[in-house]
Structure formats: C-alpha cells, structure tokens
Amino acid sequence: MQITDVRIRKIASEGKMKGIVSVTFDNEFVVHDIKVIEGQMGLFIAMPSRKTPDGEFKDIAHPINTEAREKIQTAILEAYEKAVSEEVVEG
C-alpha cells in the first residue's frame, strides 16, 4: 500500500497539537484527523480516536505493525516540515 497524498492543516494556536492530517492510500482510501503533536522527544502522530463512555480514548483506525506506523509517521512529518518551511519562506 502506497501513501499517495498527505494534506496538512496547521494549527496556529499555542499548544502541543500542531496540525491535523489526512492521508490517502493508493488513491483509493483516506484516513482523516491524524494529529501532529509536539512531545518532549519531538513531533509524533496520533491516529484518529474517539472517547469511550468511561473516558478512555480508542483508535478508530491505526496501523497494525511498526513498519506501517513508521512509514505513515515519516510521510506525515516530512509533509508537515515542508509546509512549515514553505510558510517561513513566504512570510
């Protein structure tokens, strides 16, 4: 499965969440609402989730192995960094 599109919506407010992302796979399937979050060790992604009645968050969609997660995270963070650097050049 190939990542064929990554769309970034940057978040301008102060806080740990830096962007919301949609990723398209094989030009056929899209996953919306992946979050780019700034943690103590740098940027990482959080898959879309919902809050259960007991207050726990459960992923709606997520990769089932480490390789897939790393591939998705790398593509998202590269697109995010590119979007941020283009904003700096324009601004």
UniProtKB/Swiss-Prot annotation:
Keywords: Cell cycle, Cell division, Septation. The keyword S-adenosyl-L-methionine does not apply. Disulfide bonds: none annotated. One of its GO terms (biological process) is division septum assembly. The keyword Cell division applies. Gene3D superfamilies: Stage V sporulation protein G (3.30.1120.40). It holds the Pfam family SpoVG. Could be involved in septation. Belongs to the SpoVG family. This is Putative septation protein SpoVG. It comes from Clostridium beijerinckii (strain ATCC 51743 / NCIMB 8052) (Clostridium acetobutylicum). The gene is spoVG.
